[in-house]
């Protein structure tokens, strides 16, 4: 009996270790290239915590990668580095698989798109079922532990049929994959990464879109909310860049796009009020100012005064008829409340 105890103890440890082994990264994802502007992106969803920290990789002007199933996370940075060296997507995939000496390699799933639109995919024979992939002219959709092939097929169809920029096409693909059944285990996390040269916010940032939902009962709803915010900020930045170049038409177009993603942003309505006036549309200008006032009535006057100091908009102050409509009855904006301070 005593001789059996060590063996039983070892067996228990082995069983415990096996139970603690992380499951495969079951997911459905899409990698894609936008030939119109060179954007590259990945969108992914899974019944797996924080899938965005594992699956999506991308570099502007280089390529995008999704690595999943019995995942080798190293495939992501390795693939990007090889693409930077000038290898095609197909050459990179071949090299990754040749150099992967781990025993679980047959369970891998990976998709690569390079900056020229070349696509390479691999779904190993041991990838958790159902596993597979489908390709289009500019995209590859793939997944494992799915309800069936209808998931990547629906994703590709939605991608091709959706109008607009890459972010919208990727999101539509994810939603279609979910509607087709998605991950057979359910929902938990989602992520989207899109890269564009100098497309990110602030300086030296190529991440045009980078949003993650790590743990949420409805990750698609939350991903949509974050995407709207991300794109609203992107177009807001575009508006200010156009303003700095005295491009009022471009600034208004960017502001209108920002407003479509964030309709309750007081600052955007305020800018649209000034821009419409400067471009000769006083009716729309008053409408936008009215929306800005409704959203933040307490400090509308101060906000208007701050923005009207711009040389682009000072002429509005001399337009008495317009000012009376904007600040009835005498056309004089309210003085800032000194008690509230400059940040109110």
What annotation goes with each model-predicted range?
Residues 236-237, 267-271, 301-307:
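Alpha-solenoid helical repeat scaffolds
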Residues 283-300:
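TPR/TPR-like (Sel1-like) alpha-helical repeat modules
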Residues 6-16:
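Bacterial N-terminal signal peptides
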Residues 1-4:
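Positively charged n-region of N-terminal signal peptides that target proteins for export
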């Amino acid at each position: 009996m005593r001789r059996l105890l060590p063996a039983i103890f070892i067996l228990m440890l082995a069983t415990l270790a096996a139970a603690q082994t992380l499951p495969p990264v079951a997911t459905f994802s899409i990698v894609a290239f936008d030939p119109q502007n060179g954007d590259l992106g990945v969108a992914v969803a899974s019944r797996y915590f924080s899938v965005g920290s594992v699956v999506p990789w991308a570099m502007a002007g280089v390529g995008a990668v999704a690595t999943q199933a019995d995942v080798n996370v190293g495939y992501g940075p390795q693939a990007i580095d090889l693409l930077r060296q000038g290898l095609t997507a197909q050459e990179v995939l071949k090299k990754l698989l040749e150099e992967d000496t781990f025993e679980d390699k047959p369970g891998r799933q990976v998709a690569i798109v390079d900056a020229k639109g070349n696509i390479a995919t691999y779904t190993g024979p041991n990838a958790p079922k159902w596993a597979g992939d489908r390709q289009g002219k500019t995209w590859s959709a793939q997944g494992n532990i799915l309800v069936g092939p209808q998931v990547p097929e629906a994703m590709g169809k939605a991608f091709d049929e959706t109008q607009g920029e890459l972010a919208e096409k990727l999101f539509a693909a994810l939603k279609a994959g979910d509607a087709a059944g998605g991950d057979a285990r359910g929902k938990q996390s989602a992520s989207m990464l899109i890269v564009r040269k100098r497309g990110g916010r602030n300086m030296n940032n190529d991440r045009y879109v980078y949003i993650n939902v790590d743990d949420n009962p409805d990750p698609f709803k939350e991903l949509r909310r974050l995407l709207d915010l991300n794109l609203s900020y992107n177009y807001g930045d575009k508006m200010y860049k156009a303003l700095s170049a005295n491009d009022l038409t471009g600034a208004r177009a960017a502001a209108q796009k920002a407003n479509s993603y964030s309709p309750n942003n007081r600052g955007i309505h305020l800018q649209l009020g000034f821009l419409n006036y400067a471009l000769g549309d006083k009716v729309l200008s008053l409408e936008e100012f009215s929306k800005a006032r409704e959203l933040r009535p307490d400090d509308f006057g101060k906000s208007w005064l701050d923005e009207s100091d711009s040389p682009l908009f000072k002429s509005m102050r001399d337009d008495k008829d317009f000012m009376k409509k904007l600040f009835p009855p005498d056309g004089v904006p309210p003085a800032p409340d000194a008690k509230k301070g400059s940040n109110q």
